[in-house]
Curated annotation (Swiss-Prot):
The lineage of its organism: Eukaryota, Metazoa, Cnidaria, Anthozoa, Hexacorallia. This is U-actitoxin-Avd12b. InterPro entries: EGF-like_dom. Disulfide bonds join 18-33, 27-44, 46-55. Residues 14-56 form the EGF-like domain.
């Protein structure tokens, strides 16, 4: 339910772009850092064959 929310922006599971040191160094191997405000978690959108929470693993 949307009651009590003061902003119009829809909830988005992709989160928002990370800032500061997280944007710089949280994701490895070219991954894009995202922050999910509702749960206070950072995660990475990986590129190529990389996987893992911080794109630290390469799939074979």
């Amino acid at each position: 339910s949307k009651e009590g929310m003061s902003y119009e922006e829809p909830e988005n599971d992709e989160g928002v772009a990370c800032t500061g040191q997280y944007a710089e160094s949280f994701c490895l191997n070219g991954g894009t850092c995202r922050y999910i405000q509702s749960i206070g978690e950072y995660y990475c959108i990986c590129v190529g064959d990389y996987t893992g929470h911080r794109c630290e693993k390469k799939q074979v």
